[in-house]
Amino acid sequence: MPRYSKWIRVVLLVLMPLLLPLVAAGRGLLPSADGQERLYNVRIEMEKGGMTGVCMMLRDSTGLHGSVVNEFGVGLMSFSYAFGSDKVRLHSVFGKMDKWYIRRTLRRDLRRLVHAMRDGSATYTNDRRGIRYAFTPINEDDTAR
Protein backbone atom coordinates (compact mmCIF):
# COMPACT_ATOMS: atom_id res chain seq x y z
CA MET A 1 0.00 0.00 0.00
CA PRO A 2 2.74 2.57 0.75
CA ARG A 3 4.12 2.04 -2.75
CA TYR A 4 0.84 3.19 -4.31
CA SER A 5 0.53 6.18 -2.00
CA LYS A 6 3.80 7.57 -3.40
CA TRP A 7 2.41 7.40 -6.92
CA ILE A 8 -0.84 9.00 -5.84
CA ARG A 9 1.08 11.86 -4.26
CA VAL A 10 3.20 12.32 -7.37
CA VAL A 11 0.12 12.33 -9.61
CA LEU A 12 -1.64 14.84 -7.33
CA LEU A 13 1.41 17.10 -7.25
CA VAL A 14 1.61 17.07 -11.03
CA LEU A 15 -2.12 17.48 -11.68
CA MET A 16 -2.96 20.00 -8.94
CA PRO A 17 -1.44 23.06 -10.68
CA LEU A 18 -3.25 22.06 -13.87
CA LEU A 19 -6.62 21.57 -12.17
CA LEU A 20 -6.68 24.64 -9.91
CA PRO A 21 -7.46 27.15 -12.70
CA LEU A 22 -10.32 24.91 -13.86
CA VAL A 23 -11.73 24.73 -10.35
CA ALA A 24 -11.45 28.51 -9.94
CA ALA A 25 -13.17 29.10 -13.28
CA GLY A 26 -15.91 26.65 -12.37
CA ARG A 27 -16.45 28.46 -9.09
CA GLY A 28 -17.06 31.55 -11.15
CA LEU A 29 -16.57 35.13 -10.11
CA LEU A 30 -19.34 36.40 -12.39
CA PRO A 31 -23.05 35.73 -11.87
CA SER A 32 -23.66 32.40 -13.59
CA ALA A 33 -27.43 32.22 -14.12
CA ASP A 34 -29.99 34.64 -15.53
CA GLY A 35 -31.40 36.81 -12.75
CA GLN A 36 -28.49 36.09 -10.41
CA GLU A 37 -26.73 39.04 -8.81
CA ARG A 38 -23.36 39.32 -7.13
CA LEU A 39 -21.76 41.94 -4.90
CA TYR A 40 -18.08 42.89 -5.05
CA ASN A 41 -15.73 45.11 -3.09
CA VAL A 42 -14.12 47.33 -5.71
CA ARG A 43 -10.70 48.93 -5.55
CA ILE A 44 -9.42 51.02 -8.44
CA GLU A 45 -5.84 52.19 -7.87
CA MET A 46 -3.98 54.75 -9.93
CA GLU A 47 -0.67 56.53 -9.62
CA LYS A 48 -2.15 59.66 -8.05
CA GLY A 49 -4.96 58.11 -6.04
CA GLY A 50 -7.68 55.56 -6.05
CA MET A 51 -11.30 54.72 -5.42
CA THR A 52 -13.04 52.08 -3.40
CA GLY A 53 -16.64 51.04 -3.28
CA VAL A 54 -19.15 48.30 -3.93
CA CYS A 55 -20.26 46.88 -7.27
CA MET A 56 -23.47 45.00 -7.89
CA MET A 57 -23.65 42.91 -11.06
CA LEU A 58 -26.82 41.36 -12.42
CA ARG A 59 -26.91 38.81 -15.22
CA ASP A 60 -29.71 38.52 -17.75
CA SER A 61 -30.06 36.74 -21.09
CA THR A 62 -28.16 39.43 -23.01
CA GLY A 63 -25.24 40.03 -20.64
CA LEU A 64 -24.18 41.66 -17.40
CA HIS A 65 -25.35 44.93 -15.90
CA GLY A 66 -23.29 46.57 -13.17
CA SER A 67 -23.16 49.64 -11.01
CA VAL A 68 -20.30 50.86 -8.81
CA VAL A 69 -21.06 53.03 -5.77
CA ASN A 70 -18.47 54.42 -3.35
CA GLU A 71 -18.73 54.29 0.46
CA PHE A 72 -20.63 57.58 0.57
CA GLY A 73 -23.33 56.37 -1.80
CA VAL A 74 -22.14 58.35 -4.80
CA GLY A 75 -22.49 56.41 -8.05
CA LEU A 76 -19.15 56.13 -9.84
CA MET A 77 -20.39 54.35 -12.96
CA SER A 78 -23.08 52.13 -14.42
CA PHE A 79 -22.27 49.76 -17.25
CA SER A 80 -23.47 46.77 -19.21
CA TYR A 81 -21.56 44.00 -20.97
CA ALA A 82 -23.14 42.21 -23.94
CA PHE A 83 -22.13 38.56 -24.36
CA GLY A 84 -22.95 38.43 -28.08
CA SER A 85 -20.97 41.46 -29.21
CA ASP A 86 -18.35 41.29 -26.41
CA LYS A 87 -18.74 45.03 -25.78
CA VAL A 88 -19.09 47.23 -22.71
CA ARG A 89 -21.43 50.20 -22.70
CA LEU A 90 -21.07 52.90 -20.05
CA HIS A 91 -24.46 54.31 -19.10
CA SER A 92 -23.30 56.88 -16.57
CA VAL A 93 -19.96 57.99 -15.17
CA PHE A 94 -19.20 60.24 -12.19
CA GLY A 95 -18.87 63.90 -13.28
CA LYS A 96 -15.11 64.33 -12.82
CA MET A 97 -14.47 61.09 -14.71
CA ASP A 98 -16.91 61.87 -17.53
CA LYS A 99 -14.30 62.64 -20.19
CA TRP A 100 -14.13 60.85 -23.54
CA TYR A 101 -10.62 59.47 -22.93
CA ILE A 102 -11.50 58.20 -19.44
CA ARG A 103 -14.71 56.60 -20.72
CA ARG A 104 -12.75 54.85 -23.50
CA THR A 105 -10.19 53.51 -21.01
CA LEU A 106 -12.93 52.37 -18.62
CA ARG A 107 -14.79 50.62 -21.42
CA ARG A 108 -11.71 48.72 -22.55
CA ASP A 109 -10.58 47.88 -19.02
CA LEU A 110 -14.02 46.68 -17.90
CA ARG A 111 -14.18 44.40 -20.94
CA ARG A 112 -10.80 42.92 -20.05
CA LEU A 113 -11.82 42.65 -16.40
CA VAL A 114 -14.94 40.67 -17.35
CA HIS A 115 -12.73 38.32 -19.37
CA ALA A 116 -10.35 37.97 -16.41
CA MET A 117 -13.23 37.29 -14.02
CA ARG A 118 -14.61 34.69 -16.43
CA ASP A 119 -11.18 32.99 -16.26
CA GLY A 120 -11.18 33.07 -12.44
CA SER A 121 -9.08 36.17 -11.69
CA ALA A 122 -10.52 39.04 -9.65
CA THR A 123 -7.96 41.61 -10.77
CA TYR A 124 -6.89 43.34 -13.95
CA THR A 125 -4.00 45.76 -14.42
CA ASN A 126 -3.77 48.25 -17.26
CA ASP A 127 0.02 48.50 -17.50
CA ARG A 128 -0.07 51.28 -20.07
CA ARG A 129 -2.07 53.65 -17.84
CA GLY A 130 -0.95 52.27 -14.48
CA ILE A 131 -4.48 51.42 -13.31
CA ARG A 132 -5.23 48.35 -11.20
CA TYR A 133 -8.78 47.04 -10.82
CA ALA A 134 -9.67 44.56 -8.07
CA PHE A 135 -13.20 43.15 -7.77
CA THR A 136 -13.34 40.93 -4.68
CA PRO A 137 -16.57 38.95 -4.25
CA ILE A 138 -18.54 39.67 -1.08
CA ASN A 139 -19.87 36.52 0.55
CA GLU A 140 -23.59 36.43 1.25
CA ASP A 141 -22.73 35.64 4.88
CA ASP A 142 -20.96 39.01 5.17
CA THR A 143 -23.99 40.95 3.92
CA ALA A 144 -26.43 39.24 6.29
CA ARG A 145 -24.88 40.84 9.40
Where are these regions (language model features)?
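N-terminal secretory signal peptides that target proteins for export/translocation
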Residues: 1-6
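Bacterial N-terminal signal peptides
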Residues: 11-21
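N-terminal presequence-like segments and adjacent domain-start helices
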Residues: 22-36
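Short, hydrophobic/aromatic-rich segments at coil-to-beta transitions
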Residues: 34-41, 61-67, 119-124
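N-terminal beta-strand/beta-hairpin edge segment
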Residues: 54-72
